[in-house]
Amino acid sequence: MSTWLLPENIADVLPSEARKIEELRRRLLDRFRSYGYEMVMPPLLEYLESLLTSGGADLRLRTFKLVDQLSGRTLGLRADITPQVARIDAHLLNRQGVTRLCYAGHVMHTRPRGLHATREQIQIGAEIYGHAGLEADLEIQQLMLDALHLAGLSRIRLDLGHAGVLAALLARDAQAAERGESLYDALSGKDVPLLNELTDDLGADTRAALRALPNLYGDASVLAEARTRLPVLPEITRALDDLAQLASQAKGVEVAIDLADLRGYAYHSGAMFSAYIDGVPNAIARGGRYDHVGQAYGRSRPATGFSLDLRELARISPVEARGTAILAPWAQDDALCAAVAALRDAGEVVIQALPGHDHVLDEFACDRSLVERNGAWVVEPR
């Protein structure tokens, strides 16, 4: 076996891609900071039970497992940073008011999520803890869209759903609740024959409501139809009101409502949103409310947030990250060394051409040169 081969769906990040990823990472983290979010850096490795407090069977299957040589306990390589940030908020920070946290780091998946997807993503995201009102969801939605615009993306479609609708329907019908997982699978796959089979012997109101969900999709006007076809329950009314506000505040993007889109249902407790762009089949960013995540760490707090994969964002972003630079000669000259140091201190990229290698590097656009004029080193256009 060749020593240079990597595992399937694992790849090196080469300079051009790395430069773009880093440019986007800095832009997004700076924007998060401008909203008041504080950076945290959870470890890549944790005890397995700490990583799998939420997310259900899917997260368990995606998590690499290994044995700790010190304790003998099972460890996991994180597949999602969100539970780790919830642990930090619940157990370490222990603040009483609103906490805004952000992060950026690698996550590993045992299996790729698509044919050409990587198993090593660079996840970046932001979370708000401590506020149960819709204001927090609106801020997270705005921040997510702001981040995508900052990455140069346009023609964004925002898909909105709400975990509270199905939860309310199951809560009022014990027989339906017993089939919750099967109903979730049928609705998520829009498998109408299976849905009809699962609901045949349910109460008339519950049966009609569940069968209506796959057809309740479209623009924001579908919410009016949902109010006529779904039971008048406080939880459903509140969910539809929340979706109406989220849709109205999503400026400059196309909005789609899908009350049967339940991806992440086991994880989310309220509004759910996903962002798409033309030509990319999968969501480029996902978010929503997950109020119960901190409960496993001894302190349940209202929470909402979003995340995305920086590697995928860099692949589709039109942002140009090829930096400009100053080309300087290599010489043992005190004045030259001082000039180069001063330029670098000022934030300039200065590349000194090593002897015999005077070509301009492809990774930088050397648009200026450092040359000696009348005993002084000056920068001139190339």
From Swiss-Prot:
InterPro entries: aa-tRNA-synth_II/BPL/LPL, HisRS-like_core, HisRS/HisZ, HisZ. One of its GO terms (biological process) is L-histidine biosynthetic process. GO terms for cellular component: cytoplasm. It is found in: Cytoplasm. Pathway: Amino-acid biosynthesis; L-histidine biosynthesis; L-histidine from 5-phospho-alpha-D-ribose 1-diphosphate: step 1/9. Keywords: Amino-acid biosynthesis, Cytoplasm, Histidine biosynthesis. GO terms for molecular function: histidine-tRNA ligase activity. Its main location: cytoplasm. It comes from the Bacteria. Pfam families: tRNA-synt_His. SUPFAM superfamilies: Class II aaRS and biotin synthetases (SSF55681). This function is generally fulfilled by the C-terminal part of HisG, which is missing in some bacteria such as this one. Belongs to the class-II aminoacyl-tRNA synthetase family. HisZ subfamily. Required for the first step of histidine biosynthesis. May allow the feedback regulation of ATP phosphoribosyltransferase activity by histidine. Heteromultimer composed of HisG and HisZ subunits. PANTHER family: HISTIDINE--TRNA LIGASE, MITOCHONDRIAL-RELATED, HISTIDYL-TRNA SYNTHETASE. This is ATP phosphoribosyltransferase regulatory subunit. It comes from Burkholderia orbicola (strain MC0-3). The gene is hisZ.
